[in-house]
Amino acid sequence: MKFQVSRRALIGAAAIAATMPLAAAAVAQDFPNRPLKVVIGFPAGSGADILGRNITNKLQEISGQPVVVENRPGANSNIAIGVVKNAKPDGYTMLFVANSNMAMNKWLFKSLPFDTIKDFTPVAAWAQLGFVVVVGADSKHKTLADLTALLKSKPQNKYGTTNQTALVSSEYYRQLAGFEAVNVGYRTAPDATPDVVNGTLDFMIMDGTFALGQIRNGKIKALAVTSLWRIADIPDVPTMDEQGLKGFDFAPWWATYVPAGTPAPIVAKLEGYHKQIAAMPDIKEALQKIASVPLTLGSAETAAKLAGEVAKWEPIIKAAGIVPQE
């Protein structure tokens, strides 16, 4: 059976197709015209939550619309990621999450109800958080080399972690430096701190937001920074790369995502908002106080960076023998 399409129908279809980009642009011009929602996969009051709210407060100012923050902690941020994956792709529901969740969870869980590459469109990456290698304030170790030498000299080493991200960072150090150690899990960093102080733990790689307070009150000391940049509030503490572990780079970066299928003009508008925010002097100052620095990566750059991170962490996680969770 043959089907014939009239010239008039073809012209009509072409006209509709031609107007679609214009319609999307018109929607973006009016966007946002109602409250925005940001989903964060960490508890209210946590370092991640504080980091996110620095951005949402400014987003509210720039967009002219209220921004509602919804904390959905659990499962290494998988709950929050799933919520946004199932949201309407209209730009009004956003996900604030770390690359450690978006890149590592694929290898830390047996199965996920989403694909972090295919099911989301990055808006922008806007901050990077520093971590530090810490020991008790009374420890004899003065440098990372001192600590590494001791760890290599004995088999019964212990490090502490509070989540899967911290576990991966510690294993990254262990693999590159070449020593044996076992993980001791804790519910929170405050729970683990006494065992860092008294030497039960040989070391801990700690979120800089929490660690800075403990360093200031004299409970612990930092031997190294895990990022390729030094933390402004402890400028005399060198990076792991500077101390001989060339290429060591662990500094979770934060980005905003929307569901796949969100119109490109809306993504571009949100990207512009985030770049404005990251360049604000008071945001830079606020981030510095929590061991962070601003990033200004756009949508395409963030997508490429995330893809690279997914590939980077697979061999490290598998070599560590970390059993994927259900």
Which stretches of residues belong to each language-model region?
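Paired acidic/hydrophobic, glycine-rich loop segments that form the ligand-binding mouth/hinge
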Residues: 91-97, 159-160, 202-207, 221-224, ...
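N-terminal export leaders
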Residues: 6-11
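Short beta-strand->loop
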Residues: 115-125, 160, 180-185, 202-203, ...
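N-terminal secretory signal peptides that target proteins for export/translocation
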Residues: 1-5
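An extracytoplasmic/periplasmic, membrane-proximal ligand-sensing/linker region
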Residues: 33-35, 176, 216, 242, ...
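N-terminal signal peptide c-region/cleavage motif recognized by signal peptidases
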Residues: 21-25
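Hinge/capping helix and adjacent helix->loop/strand transition within the periplasmic-binding protein
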Residues: 86-92, 107-191, 240, 253-286
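N-terminal (or domain-start) structured segment
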Residues: 26-118, 155, 165-166, 178-203, ...
